[in-house]
Swiss-Prot record:
Residues 1-155 are annotated as: Interaction with histone H3, histone H4, RAD53 and the RF-C complex. This is Histone chaperone ASF1. It comes from Saccharomyces cerevisiae (strain ATCC 204508 / S288c). It is found in: Nucleus. Its main location: nucleus. Changing residue 48 to R: Abrogates interaction with histone H3 and histone H4 and enhances transcriptional silencing. Reduces acetylation of histone H3 on 'K-9' and 'K-56'. GO terms for cellular component: chromatin; chromosome, telomeric region; cytosol; H3 histone acetyltransferase complex; nucleus. Gene3D superfamilies: Histone chaperone ASF1-like. Residues 245-254, 269-279 have a biased composition (Basic and acidic residues). Pfam families: ASF1_hist_chap. GO terms for biological process: cellular response to stress; chromatin organization; DNA replication-dependent chromatin assembly; negative regulation of DNA damage checkpoint; nucleosome assembly; nucleosome disassembly; positive regulation of transcription elongation by RNA polymerase II; protein modification process. The lineage of its organism: Eukaryota, Fungi, Dikarya, Ascomycota, Saccharomycotina.
Length: 279
């Protein structure tokens, strides 16, 4: 947790000439009393191709810092045009406003800066030699890029970040981990057994359903066979009535026999018909 929090930055003179100083109104909050001062620094990026052209415009120490919300104005001199490549004097660059505590940077704010000529004729026809007096800067104050870093403050040290080792604690933790692993394995085995039991129960239920279906099919077939037998018996009784109704002559048995033998060839004789024909 950061003891100092940046609440806001206001650019006071913007736009301005290239040769005018930079001015920022900075507001920050301090949560605890600090042993050291805060160092604020402004850096001008002279070239996008090399760090050699970066210029530290100014740096100040702010302190002692009281607890609560604080505000101050930070002023810095403009960059030296002689240290900037001529091809990058009239272009877009970056300025960096940073704050450090006890040599450790914990916040950095970057702004884009557009440098251009103040006259339309110079913008359309740039002179061979850069005229610094006619360059104006415009800081894009509405779009800062803020970067924060975690550092060690007065109430913190390396020992606080990493608790001391306690003999025997690691062994106990390992044993607890092993017991937890064993418990998890047992639970997994129980779950597997339960799943196997459920699977076997489902299979048994399916087999019972299949057997019940087979039994129902057999019963249905038996009922159909019984109906067929009853129907065949009814047909035989009708046949006997027809045979008995034939007028008898002197040889009644012969007349009955002729009627049966003269029937359709598609009718299959039953054992009863065969027995009747022999009588």
């Amino acid at each position: 947790m950061s003891i100092v929090s940046l609440l806001g930055i206001k650019v006071l003179n913007n736009p301005a000439k290239f040769t005018d100083p930079y001015e920022f109104e900075i507001t920050f909050e301090c949560l605890e009393s600090l042993k050291h001062d805060l160092e604020w620094k402004l850096t001008y990026v002279g070239s996008s191709r090399s760090l050699d052209h970066d210029q530290e415009l100014d740096s100040i120490l702010v302190g002692p810092v009281p607890v609560g919300v604080n505000k101050f104005v930070f002023s810095a001199d403009p960059p030296s045009a002689e240290l900037i490549p001529a091809s990058e004097l009239v272009s877009v660059t970056v300025i960096l406003l940073s704050c450090s505590y006890d040599g450790r940077e914990f916040v950095r704010v970057g702004y884009y800066v557009n440098n251009e000529y103040d006259e339309e004729e110079l913008r359309e026809n740039p002179p061979a030699k850069v005229q610094v007096d006619h360059i104006v800067r415009n800081i894009l104050a509405e779009k800062p890029r803020v970067t924060r870093f975690n550092i060690v403050w007065d109430n913190e040290n390396e020992g606080d970040l990493y608790p001391p080792e306690q003999p025997g604690v690691d062994d106990e933790e390992e044993e607890d981990d092993e017991e937890e692993d064993d418990d998890e394995d047992d639970e997994d085995d129980e779950d597997d057994d339960q799943e196997d039991g459920e699977g076997e129960a489902e299979e048994a239920a399916e087999e019972e359903e299949e057997e019940e279906e087979k039994t129902e099919d057999n019963e249905t077939n038996l009922e159909e066979e019984e109906e067929d037998i009853e129907n065949s018996d009814g047909d035989e009784e009708e046949g006997e009535e027809e045979v008995g109704s034939v007028d008898k002559n002197e040889d009644g048995n012969d007349k009955k026999r002729r009627k049966i033998e003269g029937g359709s060839t598609d009718i299959e004789s039953t054992p009863k018909d065969a027995a009747r024909s022999t009588n």
